[in-house]
Amino acid sequence: MSYPEPRYDGEPGMANARFRPADHAPELTNPSGGTAHYLATGESTGGQFGLYRWEMAAAPSGPKPHFHRTISESFYVLSGTILLFDGTAWIDGEPGDFLFVPEGGIHAFRNESGEPATMLILFAPGAPREDYFETTARMAGGLVLSDEDKAAFYVRHDTYWR
């Protein structure tokens, strides 16, 4: 494997880094009390990737097994215990554990420990996942979509349930 073709060919380099302080408020609070920090969105990275810090409350939460056709996802546990599904088995993910899921890989995550837990979620390329998570939070809070609208929503957001 070699490096990709250059995406920048200037000589002096650029001062274009983006800094986000640790105390930045979360962009999303779920009905369960968990929060999401959009550390880097697909928009802010020019579509290269997205990176979220996902803080799960003690209440059980997390999606059912599913897959994506257009993005890979990676999960890195920072604190607590998070159940990670690798397509065949649920694994107790503890701090420092990592799960990479290529496109098409069935996966899921849950917090059933009764304690808060935190992980990083990285997806590439940088799809606009913010609307997906914000809408599913509203659905968990009582938003009702027709079966047709719900099916279209999941397809639009590259989520296929298993």
For the regions a language model picked out, list residue spans one by one:
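Short, charged/polar surface micro-motifs in flexible loops or helix N-caps
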Residues: 44-47, 57-61, 81-83, 90, ...
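A short glycine-rich, His/Asp/Glu-containing loop-to-beta-strand
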Residues: 25-65, 71-72
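Hydrophobic small-molecule pocket/channel-lining residues, especially in calycin-type beta-barrels
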Residues: 62, 68-69, 82, 98, ...
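Short, conserved beta-strand element in jelly-roll/cupin
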Residues: 53-57, 67-86, 122-124
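Acidic/histidine-enriched, glycine/proline-rich intrinsically disordered or flexible terminal extensions
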Residues: 130-162
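Ligand-binding loop in jelly-roll beta-barrel domains
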Residues: 83, 103-130
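Short acidic-glycine-tyrosine-enriched beta hairpin
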Residues: 21, 88-106
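Long, hydrophobic/aromatic N-terminal blocks
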Residues: 1-40
